[in-house]
Amino acid sequence: PYFPPTRMKEEIKSNFDKLLTEYPSGMHVNSLLASKYFDVKQEYICVGNGAAELIKALMELFSGKIGVVYPTFEEYPNRKTTDDIVAYIPDNNDFTYSVDDLIHYFDHKQLSSLLLINPDNPSGNFIPFNQLLRLLEWSKAQQIALVVDESFVDFTDDSEKNTLLKNELLASYPQLVVVKSISKSYGVPGLRLGVLASSNEQLITTIKKDVSIWNINSFAEFYMQIFGKYEADYRNACQKFMIERSRFFNLLQEISFLRVIPSQA
């Protein structure tokens, strides 16, 4: 409810006729726009028609066993067969889990990839950056592709420290694939935008070739062109959301028959 601001929506409206009647630029320009906003190398990032398009392309490229933490966002496991999935279900009432839990469970499961939604959807469980580094080291040593969906990371405390969209980090862990929806925290699900990043440039190139030539429409492209100007508004909106989340959490705790699970999503 706090983003995008009225000024941003008015800017999009004022360009409606032009955006409606012109073709979008295509993947090269869209990747450049995303790389500038997220400060990630253009060779490391691609843009999708929502994260769902990128998830589909990514899952189709992966073979072998994939580790999945349940409950989860079903778009990922829906792209694989049941035989391909090694499921981990937390054995507690709060659906919480740690890096140690994941490593202990998946260590000898002969995975080719591991999916982590962080913060988790739908449980809201969150593994902080300093702990996540151990999972990155483990997956690198095991030669397991680690897919981290951080679509809700901007809702976390110290969110700028928690994102994995960093050139140095991506370069150090070529097995890491980061997926981020530009819908949830940005408040624009109708535009259908998402990004996928990895220093595995062969993977990025393959996905870019897999999606359609104009997978992002002109309105979504224009949004990426201008949203850097509204960065302060966006950060302020996220802070307002976190305050409201805390208020709502406290109100729910006052209801005697509810067991309220903490969330960073």
Per-region residue spans from a language model:
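Short glycine-rich anion-binding loops that position phosphate/pyrophosphate groups of nucleotides
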Residues: P1, A51, F73, N118-P122, ...
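N-terminal small-domain helix-loop-helix segment of the aminotransferase-like
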Residues: P1-G50
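PLP-dependent aminotransferase class I/II
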Residues: E11, G26, Q175-I261
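Conserved beta-loop-alpha segment that forms the PLP phosphate-binding cup at the N-terminus of a helix
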Residues: H28, Q42-I66, G194
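Hydrophobic/aromatic residues located in beta-strands of well-ordered beta-sheets
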Residues: I45, I66, I85, L146, ...
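PLP-dependent aminotransferase-like
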Residues: E53, E60-L116
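Short beta-strands and strand-loop turn motifs
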Residues: V86-I89, S113-D120, L146-E150, I261-S263
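Active-site pre-lysine segment of PLP-dependent enzymes
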Residues: Y97-D107, P122-S185
